[in-house]
């Protein structure tokens, strides 16, 4: 089974990816990891990408697509894959479609984990970190015994700058602007499976598998 997964920051996508690849016995392809491996490993594609990155430029779509194509051609993808983090734009989706067609690969479904914005804000802005030992808490889901104080070492808990409401809203704005056209694109192809991510983790997994006939 060949799948693509989308989901907002704080939507629980990472957790679901782990379960899906285990349940479906397919390979998880995180394009972020793939990118880093190519650059770190000094592959031909990685070296080309590094040139753009060192110059402070965006890596061209055709180079990213070439990396994805190379990754999909590996033996561990023969039983199927879960593509995570790509495409991010409609032109990338079109390029991916053309690549899959060239390779004789059919995309079975596109999974979209949807969570109301208010819930995402609660999840993402509630994190607190200890200044001393780095332990992580959450004001709603894993609150410290004493407000603002680390259970483990008694250190001060603080909110990281990228967890503030303004920063989180900015990230969600970018995500929504990128993803909405993709939702429409895959919806027109009849591939889109919308999953309610505002549920218990196990129920989200159940719904994801049910949408795939499992």
Swiss-Prot record:
UniProt-listed GO biological process terms: AMP salvage
Catalytic activity: AMP + ATP = 2 ADP
Binding site for ATP: 10-15, 127, 136-137, 199
Any one GO molecular-function label of the UniProt entry: ATP binding
Enzyme Commission designation: 2.7.4.3
Family affiliation: Belongs to the adenylate kinase family.
HAMAP family associated with the record: Adenylate_kinase_Adk
Protein name per Swiss-Prot or TrEMBL: Adenylate kinase
Species of the source: Desulforudis audaxviator (strain MP104C)
Source species taxonomy: Bacteria, Bacillati, Bacillota, Clostridia, Thermoanaerobacterales
